[in-house]
Regions:
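RNase H-like, Mg2+-dependent phosphodiesterase core
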Residues: 1-82, 89-243
């Protein structure tokens, strides 16, 4: 009995577990054999595997398009491309938060998108954890409540982005910013309208800045509104460091 015949002799639930619910590659010829199998369950499994292929191909194309700006810069010799985005004001009139991320070249993380489009908080948290693990480096910056009152919300957002950029552990060769330009930025930069939906680096920064666990962290560190909160920087080889 050939290996393909051995697989086809297995119960459909076992095949589903092997080739649909796990990431195990489908052996050559198995999908076509399932499509002509007389068992209804086999045909349904083949249909779902085909759908997964189409979904993966579509997601791969979407993720590649998110790298259009990064690819352009990489080909020009800018190796370290940072994305910077401001996530807005935290709950209960808290600080303005911004993130900065440098992704590895050709980085494609399934589900990476503008944080505003990721409505599931657990999914956003999962992506944030993975981005931080994979990133060349990342940082978060804050503008405090009293700073918002003093310089207004727009300029506080710029300040938070500036702080996030300054706390990256490695200096970017180029910076992509969501819709704005960072004041006193030491690296060349480009503002991109709707950048969090068009650039993988900016999208990653928006997710890091909007991490759901942060409000709990702020509350435990600074229970009194207006208390200065730490600026956080983390790389693969570093622990969280306060200002």
């Amino acid at each position: 009995m050939s290996s393909l015949e051995t697989l086809l002799s297995k119960p459909i639930p076992e095949l589903r577990q092997l080739f649909l619910e796990s990431s195990r590659p489908v052996p050559k010829g198995l999908l076509e054999a399932l499509e002509v199998d007389r068992r209804h369950g086999a045909q349904q499994l083949a249909k779902r595997i085909r759908q997964r292929y189409r979904s993966n191909r579509s997601e791969g194309q979407r993720l590649h398009s998110l790298l259009r700006f990064e690819i352009e810069l990489w080909t020009q010799g800018y190796s370290l491309v940072a994305g910077v985005d401001e996530a807005g004001m935290a709950p209960l009139a808290g600080p303005v938060v911004a993130g900065a991320v440098i992704l590895p070249k050709n980085y494609k993380l399934r589900g990476l998108n503008d944080s505003k489009k990721i409505l599931d908080e657990s999914k956003r948290e999962e992506l944030a954890v993975q981005i931080k693990e994979d990133a060349v480096c990342w940082a978060v910056g804050f503008a405090e409540v009293e700073e918002i009152d003093r310089i207004n919300i727009y300029h506080a957002g710029l300040l938070a982005m500036q702080r996030a950029f300054q706390r990256l552990s490695c200096c970017p060769d180029f910076v992509l910013v969501d819709a704005r330009r960072i004041p006193n930025c030491a690296s060349p930069q480009r503002g991109i309208i709707h950048g969090d939906a068009l650039s993988a680096s900016i999208a990653a920064a928006s997710i890091v800045a909007k991490q759901p666990a942060m409000p709990t962290c702020w509350k435990s560190i600074a229970p009194i509104q207006g208390t200065v909160l730490p600026l956080i920087r983390v790389t693969r080889r570093q622990n969280i460091a306060g200002r």
